[in-house]
């Protein structure tokens, strides 16, 4: 299931990388664009890594606040 969700994202990222710089700043040859692909993918991977490193901490905070809310929860007696 995850693979199905990530494939469109991967296609969009590859299209963005292959698009290269804007035409006003465009390189005269396509070889320069192909040389930049590994660096662009590495930067993208590093950004993803940084984003996913924060997930455990955010989950821990969420679960802690949820547990605190459950501790303070009282069922009203009718």
Curated annotation (Swiss-Prot):
GO CC annotation: high-density lipoprotein particle; very-low-density lipoprotein particle
Record localization: Secreted
Secreted keyword on record: yes
Annotated signal sequence range: 1-26
One example GO MF annotation: phospholipase inhibitor activity
InterPro entries referenced in this protein's UniProt entry, alphabetically: ApoC-I
GO biological process: lipid transport; lipoprotein metabolic process; negative regulation of cholesterol transport; negative regulation of lipid catabolic process; negative regulation of very-low-density lipoprotein particle clearance; triglyceride metabolic process; very-low-density lipoprotein particle clearance
Primary location class: secreted
UniProt entry keywords in alphabetical sequence: Lipid transport, Secreted, Signal, Transport, VLDL
Function in brief: Inhibitor of lipoprotein binding to the low density lipoprotein (LDL) receptor, LDL receptor-related protein, and very low density lipoprotein (VLDL) receptor. Associates with high density lipoproteins (HDL) and the triacylglycerol-rich lipoproteins in the plasma and makes up about 10% of the protein of the VLDL and 2% of that of HDL. Appears to interfere directly with fatty acid uptake and is also the major plasma inhibitor of cholesteryl ester transfer protein (CETP). Binds free fatty acids and reduces their intracellular esterification.
The family this protein is said to belong to: Belongs to the apolipoprotein C1 family.
Name of the protein: Apolipoprotein C-I
UniProt source species: Lynx pardinus (Iberian lynx)
